[in-house]
Amino acid sequence: MKCEVCGIEFPDGINPNGCRPYTMCILCMHLQRLGLPFKYLSASIADYKNGLSKWFDSKNSLFIHGGVGTGKTWLMSALMRESIVSSAYHYKRNIFKEEERVTYKRDYLFVSFPEIAMKIRASMNSRTSETESTIVEKYGTIQNLFLDDIGAEKSSEYMQSILFMLIEMRNTGRNRRTVITSNLSLNMLAQQHGERVASRIAEMCDVVKLSGSDRRLQ
């Protein structure tokens, strides 16, 4: 059977509730559970020719910035997919059979900062188990965070403090890797959202700039 997203062949199988066959491969379903939007599930680093393959050999975080529509989220999604694939654990379900199974790590999350801000606002106005601190801790402590679209939120002292708290938690934690995208350069981020945030990102991240016109309009 062929995955409807990435096109790879995978064995026929019935989903857990038995209602219908799978239409996506295990990797694409896993990525979707980790928060990656459907439209980015098939993103591949093969789409980029800028030497980012060396990023996988480093332990550095990454800050990707550029204008609207230059492919920042697509690139970040490709890095997430490739990182999960390269760290997968392969094993044989039965030593007497040649069939190989694979387990993908779960210590990855994809989220946009506007989504985090929305969750925090919702926690203040409803009776949920989530609070500001639990939301920040969730994304601040996961080993691999793919944080999309920082700087898109309207700047306020409160949201600046939330963003700084999150970045600081990731910067000071052990073995925490972060990939961040923004329409703003670090200088612009400092002007609009505070120097502390921009300084911490510069400290922890390699910087990649994507240039060009809006690909969505071409």
Question: Language-model segments: which ranges?
Answer:
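A short, basic N-terminal segment
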Residues: 1-54, 207-208, 212, 218
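Short glycine-rich substrate-engagement loop in P-loop NTPases that contacts/grips substrate
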Residues: 84-141, 157
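Residue-level preference for the first positions of well-ordered beta-strands
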Residues: 61-63, 107-108, 144, 177-179
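Short, well-ordered alpha-helix to beta-strand connector turns
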Residues: 59, 142-143, 204-205
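GG-anchored amphipathic helix commonly corresponding to the ABC/SMC/Rad50 NBD signature/C-loop
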Residues: 77-85
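Walker A/P-loop nucleotide-binding motif
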Residues: 59-78
